[in-house]
Amino acid sequence: MTVCAKKHVHLTRDAAEQLLADIDRRLDQLLPVEGERDVVGAAMREGALAPGKRIRPMLLLLTARDLGCAVSHDGLLDLACAVEMVHAASLILDDMPCMDDAKLRRGRPTIHSHYGEHVAILAAVALLSKAFGVIADADGLTPLAKNRAVSELSNAIGMQGLVQGQFKDLSEGDKPRSAEAILMTNHFKTSTLFCASMQMASIVANASSEARDCLHRFSLDLGQAFQLLDDLTDGMTDTGKDSNQDAGKSTLVNLLGPRAVEERLRQHLQLASEHLSAACQHGHATQHFIQAWFDKKLAAVS
Protein backbone atom coordinates (compact mmCIF):
# COMPACT_ATOMS: atom_id res chain seq x y z
CA MET A 1 0.00 0.00 0.00
CA THR A 2 1.28 3.47 -0.84
CA VAL A 3 0.10 6.75 0.62
CA CYS A 4 1.24 10.33 0.23
CA ALA A 5 4.30 11.12 2.30
CA LYS A 6 5.21 14.47 3.75
CA LYS A 7 7.58 16.52 1.64
CA HIS A 8 11.29 15.86 2.22
CA VAL A 9 12.93 18.98 0.83
CA HIS A 10 16.43 18.43 2.19
CA LEU A 11 18.32 15.62 3.84
CA THR A 12 19.94 16.42 7.16
CA ARG A 13 23.08 14.65 8.26
CA ASP A 14 21.21 13.05 11.15
CA ALA A 15 18.50 11.78 8.80
CA ALA A 16 21.08 10.29 6.43
CA GLU A 17 22.89 8.59 9.29
CA GLN A 18 19.60 7.18 10.57
CA LEU A 19 18.76 5.74 7.16
CA LEU A 20 22.20 4.18 6.94
CA ALA A 21 21.76 2.67 10.40
CA ASP A 22 18.33 1.33 9.39
CA ILE A 23 19.82 -0.35 6.32
CA ASP A 24 22.62 -1.97 8.32
CA ARG A 25 20.21 -3.09 11.04
CA ARG A 26 17.86 -4.71 8.55
CA LEU A 27 20.72 -6.34 6.64
CA ASP A 28 21.94 -7.83 9.90
CA GLN A 29 18.46 -9.23 10.57
CA LEU A 30 18.05 -10.68 7.07
CA LEU A 31 21.43 -12.36 6.75
CA PRO A 32 22.15 -15.79 8.28
CA VAL A 33 23.03 -15.84 11.95
CA GLU A 34 26.75 -16.47 12.09
CA GLY A 35 27.55 -19.94 13.37
CA GLU A 36 30.88 -21.39 14.35
CA ARG A 37 30.89 -23.83 11.42
CA ASP A 38 28.86 -21.82 8.93
CA VAL A 39 31.73 -20.42 6.91
CA VAL A 40 29.57 -19.50 3.91
CA GLY A 41 27.16 -17.61 6.16
CA ALA A 42 30.07 -15.77 7.75
CA ALA A 43 31.38 -14.83 4.30
CA MET A 44 27.92 -13.58 3.30
CA ARG A 45 27.76 -11.38 6.36
CA GLU A 46 31.29 -10.09 5.86
CA GLY A 47 30.61 -9.26 2.22
CA ALA A 48 27.33 -7.45 2.87
CA LEU A 49 27.91 -5.89 6.29
CA ALA A 50 31.47 -4.60 5.90
CA PRO A 51 31.40 -0.80 6.31
CA GLY A 52 30.40 0.73 2.99
CA LYS A 53 28.64 3.67 1.38
CA ARG A 54 25.30 1.86 0.87
CA ILE A 55 24.71 4.27 -2.01
CA ARG A 56 22.22 2.11 -3.91
CA PRO A 57 19.90 1.30 -1.00
CA MET A 58 20.09 4.90 0.19
CA LEU A 59 19.07 6.13 -3.25
CA LEU A 60 16.18 3.67 -3.40
CA LEU A 61 14.80 4.84 -0.06
CA LEU A 62 15.32 8.54 -0.72
CA THR A 63 13.89 8.41 -4.23
CA ALA A 64 10.78 6.57 -3.05
CA ARG A 65 10.22 9.35 -0.52
CA ASP A 66 10.86 12.08 -3.06
CA LEU A 67 8.27 10.42 -5.30
CA GLY A 68 5.75 10.88 -2.52
CA CYS A 69 5.81 7.34 -1.20
CA ALA A 70 5.16 6.29 2.38
CA VAL A 71 5.03 2.50 2.69
CA SER A 72 5.45 -0.11 5.36
CA HIS A 73 8.96 0.83 6.44
CA ASP A 74 10.33 -2.70 6.50
CA GLY A 75 8.86 -3.47 3.07
CA LEU A 76 10.67 -0.62 1.36
CA LEU A 77 13.74 -1.25 3.48
CA ASP A 78 13.77 -4.88 2.38
CA LEU A 79 13.93 -3.86 -1.28
CA ALA A 80 16.86 -1.60 -0.45
CA CYS A 81 18.63 -4.45 1.35
CA ALA A 82 18.04 -6.78 -1.59
CA VAL A 83 19.82 -4.31 -3.86
CA GLU A 84 22.74 -4.09 -1.42
CA MET A 85 23.00 -7.90 -1.32
CA VAL A 86 23.27 -7.99 -5.11
CA HIS A 87 25.91 -5.25 -5.04
CA ALA A 88 27.88 -7.12 -2.36
CA ALA A 89 27.72 -10.35 -4.37
CA SER A 90 29.00 -8.55 -7.47
CA LEU A 91 31.96 -7.15 -5.52
CA ILE A 92 32.87 -10.59 -4.18
CA LEU A 93 32.91 -11.99 -7.72
CA ASP A 94 34.68 -8.97 -9.25
CA ASP A 95 37.50 -9.35 -6.73
CA MET A 96 38.18 -13.03 -7.55
CA PRO A 97 41.65 -13.98 -8.85
CA CYS A 98 40.17 -15.00 -12.21
CA MET A 99 38.70 -11.51 -12.59
CA ASP A 100 40.21 -8.39 -10.98
CA ASP A 101 42.40 -10.31 -8.52
CA ALA A 102 41.90 -7.74 -5.77
CA LYS A 103 43.25 -8.13 -2.26
CA LEU A 104 41.45 -5.29 -0.47
CA ARG A 105 37.81 -4.21 -0.40
CA ARG A 106 36.18 -1.69 1.93
CA GLY A 107 39.40 -1.52 3.90
CA ARG A 108 39.41 -5.27 4.60
CA PRO A 109 40.82 -8.37 2.91
CA THR A 110 38.61 -9.47 0.03
CA ILE A 111 36.28 -12.39 0.73
CA HIS A 112 38.28 -14.90 -1.31
CA SER A 113 41.50 -13.78 0.42
CA HIS A 114 39.93 -14.38 3.82
CA TYR A 115 37.75 -17.44 3.25
CA GLY A 116 39.09 -19.01 0.06
CA GLU A 117 37.82 -18.89 -3.50
CA HIS A 118 35.32 -21.73 -3.11
CA VAL A 119 33.62 -20.07 -0.14
CA ALA A 120 33.60 -16.70 -1.90
CA ILE A 121 31.79 -18.08 -4.93
CA LEU A 122 29.21 -19.87 -2.78
CA ALA A 123 28.68 -16.77 -0.63
CA ALA A 124 28.06 -14.64 -3.73
CA VAL A 125 25.54 -17.14 -5.10
CA ALA A 126 23.83 -17.31 -1.70
CA LEU A 127 23.60 -13.51 -1.51
CA LEU A 128 21.99 -13.35 -4.94
CA SER A 129 19.51 -16.05 -3.95
CA LYS A 130 18.76 -14.31 -0.66
CA ALA A 131 18.11 -11.00 -2.42
CA PHE A 132 15.24 -12.45 -4.42
CA GLY A 133 13.86 -14.24 -1.37
CA VAL A 134 13.86 -10.95 0.53
CA ILE A 135 11.79 -9.30 -2.20
CA ALA A 136 9.34 -12.20 -2.26
CA ASP A 137 8.83 -11.96 1.51
CA ALA A 138 8.74 -8.15 1.78
CA ASP A 139 5.84 -6.77 3.81
CA GLY A 140 3.42 -4.15 2.54
CA LEU A 141 3.97 -4.75 -1.17
CA THR A 142 1.47 -6.18 -3.63
CA PRO A 143 2.31 -9.39 -5.53
CA LEU A 144 2.50 -7.34 -8.74
CA ALA A 145 4.95 -4.89 -7.18
CA LYS A 146 7.13 -7.78 -6.01
CA ASN A 147 7.06 -9.40 -9.45
CA ARG A 148 8.08 -6.15 -11.12
CA ALA A 149 10.86 -5.59 -8.57
CA VAL A 150 12.21 -9.10 -9.20
CA SER A 151 12.15 -8.44 -12.94
CA GLU A 152 14.08 -5.18 -12.58
CA LEU A 153 16.73 -6.71 -10.35
CA SER A 154 17.19 -9.85 -12.45
CA ASN A 155 17.66 -7.75 -15.58
CA ALA A 156 20.29 -5.65 -13.81
CA ILE A 157 22.27 -8.76 -12.88
CA GLY A 158 22.24 -10.72 -16.15
CA MET A 159 23.44 -10.28 -19.71
CA GLN A 160 21.90 -6.82 -19.92
CA GLY A 161 23.59 -5.76 -16.72
CA LEU A 162 26.41 -6.67 -14.35
CA VAL A 163 27.37 -9.94 -16.04
CA GLN A 164 27.70 -8.26 -19.42
CA GLY A 165 29.66 -5.36 -17.96
CA GLN A 166 32.15 -7.57 -16.18
CA PHE A 167 32.60 -9.74 -19.26
CA LYS A 168 33.26 -6.71 -21.44
CA ASP A 169 35.71 -5.32 -18.91
CA LEU A 170 37.61 -8.62 -18.69
CA SER A 171 37.64 -9.37 -22.41
CA GLU A 172 38.18 -5.86 -23.78
CA GLY A 173 39.57 -3.78 -20.92
CA ASP A 174 43.24 -4.31 -21.75
CA LYS A 175 42.74 -3.55 -25.46
CA PRO A 176 42.50 -0.17 -27.17
CA ARG A 177 38.88 1.00 -27.09
CA SER A 178 36.94 4.01 -28.25
CA ALA A 179 35.30 6.32 -25.74
CA GLU A 180 31.92 4.97 -26.85
CA ALA A 181 32.96 1.37 -26.12
CA ILE A 182 34.22 2.35 -22.67
CA LEU A 183 30.98 4.17 -21.91
CA MET A 184 28.98 1.09 -22.90
CA THR A 185 31.00 -1.08 -20.51
CA ASN A 186 30.51 1.51 -17.78
CA HIS A 187 26.77 1.41 -18.46
CA PHE A 188 26.54 -2.33 -17.89
CA LYS A 189 28.93 -2.36 -14.93
CA THR A 190 27.42 0.53 -13.02
CA SER A 191 24.33 2.21 -14.47
CA THR A 192 22.13 -0.88 -14.64
CA LEU A 193 22.01 -1.54 -10.89
CA PHE A 194 21.30 2.14 -10.26
CA CYS A 195 18.50 1.86 -12.80
CA ALA A 196 17.02 -1.16 -11.02
CA SER A 197 17.16 0.69 -7.70
CA MET A 198 15.35 3.71 -9.13
CA GLN A 199 12.74 1.63 -10.92
CA MET A 200 12.07 -0.39 -7.77
CA ALA A 201 11.48 2.89 -5.93
CA SER A 202 9.11 4.02 -8.67
CA ILE A 203 7.23 0.71 -8.54
CA VAL A 204 6.54 1.05 -4.83
CA ALA A 205 5.59 4.72 -5.27
CA ASN A 206 3.33 3.92 -8.22
CA ALA A 207 5.10 6.64 -10.18
CA SER A 208 3.96 7.79 -13.61
CA SER A 209 5.58 6.52 -16.80
CA GLU A 210 7.05 9.99 -17.29
CA ALA A 211 8.70 9.89 -13.87
CA ARG A 212 10.03 6.39 -14.50
CA ASP A 213 11.53 7.53 -17.79
CA CYS A 214 13.24 10.48 -16.07
CA LEU A 215 14.60 8.15 -13.40
CA HIS A 216 15.94 5.83 -16.09
CA ARG A 217 17.82 8.72 -17.67
CA PHE A 218 19.01 9.83 -14.24
CA SER A 219 20.42 6.36 -13.61
CA LEU A 220 22.33 6.32 -16.89
CA ASP A 221 24.09 9.60 -16.14
CA LEU A 222 24.63 8.79 -12.47
CA GLY A 223 26.21 5.45 -13.34
CA GLN A 224 28.61 7.09 -15.76
CA ALA A 225 29.53 9.70 -13.14
CA PHE A 226 30.22 7.02 -10.54
CA GLN A 227 32.40 5.01 -12.90
CA LEU A 228 34.36 8.08 -13.96
CA LEU A 229 34.93 8.97 -10.31
CA ASP A 230 36.14 5.42 -9.69
CA ASP A 231 38.59 5.78 -12.58
CA LEU A 232 39.82 9.15 -11.32
CA THR A 233 40.52 7.78 -7.83
CA ASP A 234 42.18 4.56 -9.03
CA GLY A 235 45.67 5.68 -8.01
CA MET A 236 44.64 6.91 -4.56
CA THR A 237 45.60 4.84 -1.53
CA ASP A 238 42.79 5.78 0.87
CA THR A 239 39.81 4.37 -1.02
CA GLY A 240 39.57 1.14 0.98
CA LYS A 241 40.49 -1.02 -2.02
CA ASP A 242 43.52 -1.87 -4.14
CA SER A 243 45.06 1.12 -5.89
CA ASN A 244 46.13 1.19 -9.54
CA GLN A 245 43.71 -1.58 -10.51
CA ASP A 246 43.25 0.16 -13.87
CA ALA A 247 46.94 0.20 -14.78
CA GLY A 248 47.24 -0.92 -18.39
CA LYS A 249 43.48 -0.82 -18.96
CA SER A 250 41.65 1.30 -21.49
CA THR A 251 39.73 3.77 -19.36
CA LEU A 252 38.57 7.26 -20.21
CA VAL A 253 41.20 8.64 -17.83
CA ASN A 254 43.94 6.91 -19.81
CA LEU A 255 42.31 7.90 -23.10
CA LEU A 256 41.37 11.55 -22.42
CA GLY A 257 43.26 12.54 -19.28
CA PRO A 258 42.01 13.36 -15.77
CA ARG A 259 40.93 16.95 -16.46
CA ALA A 260 38.71 16.02 -19.41
CA VAL A 261 37.24 13.12 -17.46
CA GLU A 262 36.41 15.33 -14.48
CA GLU A 263 34.64 17.72 -16.84
CA ARG A 264 32.65 14.84 -18.32
CA LEU A 265 31.80 13.67 -14.82
CA ARG A 266 30.39 17.08 -13.91
CA GLN A 267 28.36 17.13 -17.13
CA HIS A 268 26.85 13.75 -16.25
CA LEU A 269 26.02 15.03 -12.76
CA GLN A 270 24.29 18.09 -14.19
CA LEU A 271 22.18 15.97 -16.51
CA ALA A 272 21.41 13.54 -13.69
CA SER A 273 20.27 16.45 -11.54
CA GLU A 274 17.93 17.71 -14.26
CA HIS A 275 16.37 14.28 -14.78
CA LEU A 276 15.93 13.75 -11.04
CA SER A 277 14.27 17.13 -10.57
CA ALA A 278 11.82 16.33 -13.35
CA ALA A 279 10.91 12.99 -11.76
CA CYS A 280 10.64 13.89 -8.08
CA GLN A 281 7.92 16.38 -7.21
CA HIS A 282 7.66 15.66 -3.49
CA GLY A 283 11.14 16.51 -2.25
CA HIS A 284 14.81 16.97 -3.00
CA ALA A 285 16.46 14.69 -0.45
CA THR A 286 17.93 12.44 -3.15
CA GLN A 287 19.33 15.46 -4.96
CA HIS A 288 20.90 16.76 -1.76
CA PHE A 289 22.42 13.38 -0.95
CA ILE A 290 24.01 12.93 -4.38
CA GLN A 291 25.36 16.47 -4.52
CA ALA A 292 26.91 16.29 -1.05
CA TRP A 293 28.49 12.92 -1.74
CA PHE A 294 30.09 13.94 -5.04
CA ASP A 295 31.21 17.32 -3.69
CA LYS A 296 33.14 15.53 -0.97
CA LYS A 297 34.71 13.00 -3.33
CA LEU A 298 35.64 15.52 -6.01
CA ALA A 299 37.25 17.79 -3.43
CA ALA A 300 39.66 14.95 -2.65
CA VAL A 301 40.47 14.46 -6.33
CA SER A 302 41.06 18.13 -7.19
From Swiss-Prot:
An annotated GO BP: geranylgeranyl diphosphate biosynthetic process
UniProt GO MF annotations: geranylgeranyl diphosphate synthase activity; metal ion binding
SUPFAM superfamilies referenced in this protein's UniProt entry, alphabetically: Terpenoid synthases (SSF48576)
Reaction catalysed by this enzyme: isopentenyl diphosphate + (2E,6E)-farnesyl diphosphate = (2E,6E,10E)-geranylgeranyl diphosphate + diphosphate
UniProt keyword terms in alphabetical order: Carotenoid biosynthesis, Isoprene biosynthesis, Magnesium, Metal-binding, Transferase
Listed pathway(s): Isoprenoid biosynthesis; geranylgeranyl diphosphate biosynthesis; geranylgeranyl diphosphate from farnesyl diphosphate and isopentenyl diphosphate: step 1/1
EC number: 2.5.1.29
Manner of cofactor binding, per the entry note: Binds 2 Mg(2+) ions per subunit.
Binding locations of Mg(2+) 2: 94, 100
Residues reported in the UniProt entry to bind Mg(2+) 1: 94, 100
Positions of isopentenyl diphosphate binding: 53, 56, 87, 106
Record-listed (2E,6E)-farnesyl diphosphate binding positions: 105, 189-190, 227
Family in the record: Belongs to the FPP/GGPP synthase family.
The name this protein goes by in its record: Geranylgeranyl diphosphate synthase
Species per Swiss-Prot/TrEMBL record: Pantoea ananas
